[in-house]
Swiss-Prot record:
It comes from Vibrio parahaemolyticus serotype O3:K6 (strain RIMD 2210633). This is Large ribosomal subunit protein bL31B. InterPro entries: Ribosomal_bL28/bL31-like_sf, Ribosomal_bL31, Ribosomal_bL31_B, Ribosomal_bL31_sf. Signal peptide: none annotated. GO terms for molecular function: structural constituent of ribosome. The gene is rpmE2.
């Protein structure tokens, strides 16, 4: 392998904020945030909105989506102003 062209592969702590779950996975993700893990070591830290711990496909449970999409937000605010052509 050529030196200097491959990304830095290291353990990273991912935090699923919707269910407050933490897990360590090997990744090449770059982040400036760090967190001290249960083993006393400091790891890079990254937050997630959805992971296998919270996604309905993996959990088998439906959940209310808290972050509404931009289009749905636009339609909610301005949907009443649509003109109907006759």
């Amino acid at each position: 392998m050529k030196p200097g062209i491959h990304p830095d592969y290291r353990p990273v702590v991912f935090h699923d904020t919707s269910v407050d779950e933490y897990f360590v996975v090997g990744s090449t993700l770059k982040t400036d945030r760090t967190i001290e893990w249960k083993d006393g070591k400091t790891y890079p830290y990254f937050t997630l909105d959805v992971s296998s711990s919270s996604h309905p496909f993996y959990t088998g449970k439906q959940r209310v989506v808290q972050a509404e999409g931009r289009i749905a937000n636009f339609n909610r605010r301005f949907g009443q102003f649509t003109s109907e052509k006759e």
